[in-house]
Amino acid sequence: MKKTYAVITGASSGIGMAFARQLAAEGYRLVLIARRENRLQALAEELNKSGTESMIITADLSEKEACYRLMQQLEPVPVGILINNAGFGDCGSFLETDADKEMQMIDVNVKAMHLLMKLMLRRMEKQEGGYILNVASSAGLLPAGP
């Protein structure tokens, strides 16, 4: 088992879940973060059965204060990797998509990723090491959404 934890946002499904399973197979301890506690709990139970130490934190990263709370919760945790994976998209005609949903999307996909990267990078600089992976989608290159 590795000494440090891998922190994964958006861990409850898709790419985040795949990262969790892969890093567990490589011996990392995990901090799994997402909005849906039931999905996080199911993943943590699956990984714990295979001997992986994992903890879950529910957070809505569209809220700036949730990012700061998350970093406070991580203070006692030896973090070696941050996988900044939380995000979502929307599709449809620009004039027909919901503006509030788009603002929330920007809050998660851009602002939360930026803030968590900045705060974790400061921490990693003090501890003289660590890795950050920011996950993005090619969907941003398509004409379907903001």
Which residues fall in each region the model found?
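Conserved glycine-rich Rossmann-like NAD(P)H-binding loop of the short-chain dehydrogenase/reductase
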Residues: 26-43
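The beta1-alpha1 cofactor-binding region of Rossmann-like NAD(H)/NADP(H)-dependent oxidoreductases
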Residues: 38, 58-69, 99
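Hydrophobic positions on the long internal alpha-helix
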Residues: 83, 116-120
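Conserved NAD(P)H cofactor-binding loop of Rossmann-fold oxidoreductase domains
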Residues: 85-90
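Substrate-binding pocket helix/loop in short-chain dehydrogenase/reductase
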Residues: 93-95, 101-106
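Residue(s) in the substrate-gating loop at a strand-loop-helix junction
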Residues: 137
